Structure formats: structure tokens, C-alpha cells
């Protein structure tokens, strides 16, 4: 899923830059992948204005700082564009075994925000393989199933990583792309306190 609305200005800016990369993905990768190339489909994205997200006001303020486009939709516009939406309110969230689960609680959604620069990549796994091909074409190397257990530092700066099998790789730069588990890598590097947000694998 590609979207531009996040909880920090930096996150929004990085995501917005990424949209333009995805639009020209094959050119960005610069090499042919025998498995084919991932394709980005720009569909736009809608988020409902509700009390739980402060009616998206803080979100839109962040987007305005960067210049990321968004469009305010009232209930009539939502019904026009997405007639299958049920705009009745069901909050607060309830468990499936709650007798009132799925029952409206009164009132209706007041509006939404449409983000035109959003969509999805048809095959995320293929996209990562595209990146692998580009890295290998540039002389890079991959080690799969090689767990990092330590990030070595000298005088407060990164000096390399240690793998589970004891292999040491010297480097002055470590890029953390561990996704939901990135906080574990940040902890190894001792930089958790520098992070504005925390990450973790979770089920929602």
C-alpha cells in the first residue's frame, strides 16, 4: 500500500517522494529483472474524518507543510464516489462476541479526506527482487537467512555488524530496513532515544 498520510512530517515527506519513484519504477531500478517488474497502480485513498483521528485536521496540516495534495469530501461526495460506504457511526470498536457488535451507535460520519497520490504495488515481493537485481548490478552482495546479532561501534560511531554465525562485516554505514522489527535493530545500535516514533510487529 502506498500512501502519503503519516503521523510525522518527515514520514509524509519520505512517502510523497516515494510515490514519484513508484510511478517510474522500472526507470528507477535501471536494470531488467528476469521475473518481470513490479507495477504501481495509483488509485487514490480515502480516510474518514472521525473523532478518533481528530477529524484528520492534524494530518492535513502536516500535508500542507510539504505541499502534498488532499481534497475535502463531505457526506454527499462520499456517497457519489463510493456509494457502497455505510456512513452510520459504529464507534467505539467492539469485540466480535459483544452483543452490540455491528450495531450503529447514532449519528453519521461527517466527511472524509481524499488523497490523490496513493495506491498499491501489484507484487511487493517482486518489487524487492527488482531492488535485489539493481543492487547486484551495481556490485552489491546479499546474504540471506543471516541474522544480525550485534552492531559494532567505535567511538560512538558504527563500525560494522556481527552475524549469528560470528561473521563480522566492517562498514561505516548500516541502513535499517527491518520493517516492523526495526526497533530491535535500533536497540542494537543504541539509537532508540533518537526516534520520534516506535515500531513493532503488531496485529490490528
Region locations from a protein language model:
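Short beta-strand to alpha-helix junction loop
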Residues: 13-14, 47-55, 114-136, 143
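General beta-strand structural signal in soluble alpha/beta enzymes
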Residues: 71-74, 143-144, 176
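Central helical "cap/lid" subdomain
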Residues: 165-204
Amino acid at each position: 500500500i502506498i500512501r502519503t498520510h503519516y503521523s510525522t512530517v518527515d514520514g509524509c515527506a519520505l512517502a510523497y517522494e516515494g510515490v514519484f519513484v513508484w510511478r517510474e519504477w522500472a526507470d528507477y531500478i535501471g536494470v531488467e529483472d528476469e521475473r518481470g517488474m513490479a507495477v504501481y497502480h495509483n488509485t487514490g485513498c480515502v480516510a474518514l474524518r472521525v473523532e478518533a483521528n481528530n477529524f484528520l485536521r492534524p494530518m492535513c496540516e502536516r500535508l500542507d507543510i510539504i505541499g502534498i495534495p488532499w481534497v475535502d469530501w463531505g457526506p454527499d461526495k462520499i456517497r457519489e464516489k463510493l456509494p457502497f460506504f455505510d456512513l452510520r457511526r459504529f464507534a467505539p470498536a467492539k469485540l466480535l462476541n459483544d452483543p452490540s457488535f455491528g450495531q450503529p451507535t447514532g449519528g453519521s460520519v461527517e466527511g472524509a479526506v481524499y488523497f490523490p497520490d496513493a495506491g498499491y504495488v501489484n507484487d511487493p515481493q517482486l518489487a524487492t527482487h527488482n531492488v535485489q537485481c539493481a543492487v547486484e548490478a551495481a556490485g552489491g552482495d546479499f546474504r540471506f537467512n543471516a541474522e544480525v546479532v550485534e552492531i559494532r561501534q567505535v567511538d560512538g560511531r558504527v563500525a560494522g555488524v556481527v552475524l549469528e554465525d560470528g561473521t563480522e562485516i566492517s562498514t561505516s554505514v548500516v541502513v535499517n530496513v527491518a520493517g516492523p522489527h526495526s526497533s530491535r535493530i535500533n536497540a542494537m545500535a543504541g539509537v532508540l532515544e533518537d526516534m520520534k516514533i516506535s515500531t513493532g510487529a503488531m496485529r490490528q
